């Protein structure tokens, strides 16, 4: 997965987490997620073109999801920004390994298919539930 794919996942998850607030400014998403604003603009534009986001300009502007988090899969978001048919496209796909001459294309195809199956069934609603469960397991430590 590229940085663009990772940033897209972070941005959509951030918007899903804060969706009750309505429009979320790009600067807030960038600051919370540690994403350069110029790069985030490109990612959000791709997600907007794909129909996952809507935006409003101006001082009270920002971005919001156009669908519920349960209706957006991680795979769909990755494809929107990566522009590929698979979320995992290995470098050198189809090349032969050095030394023994085994064709690794079949292995990469299986790995890519397995990753696709996971991200195509995993929604941002699922990620929100996981984050909430992880937060509930974190207990404060009091040191005296």
Task: Identify the meaning behind each predicted range.
Residues 94-144:
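C-terminal regulatory/oligomerization modules of transcriptional regulators
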Residues 1-12:
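Short alpha-helical segments that sit at the start of domains
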Residues 38:
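Key DNA-contact positions within bacterial/archaeal DNA-binding proteins
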Residues 69-93, 109-114:
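Conserved segment of winged-helix/HTH DNA-binding domains
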Residues 24-34:
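A short alpha-helical element within helix-turn-helix/winged-helix DNA-binding domains
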Residues 15, 29, 43-50:
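Basic amphipathic alpha-helical segments that dock to polyanions
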Residues 52-66:
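Beta-hairpin "wing" of winged helix-turn-helix
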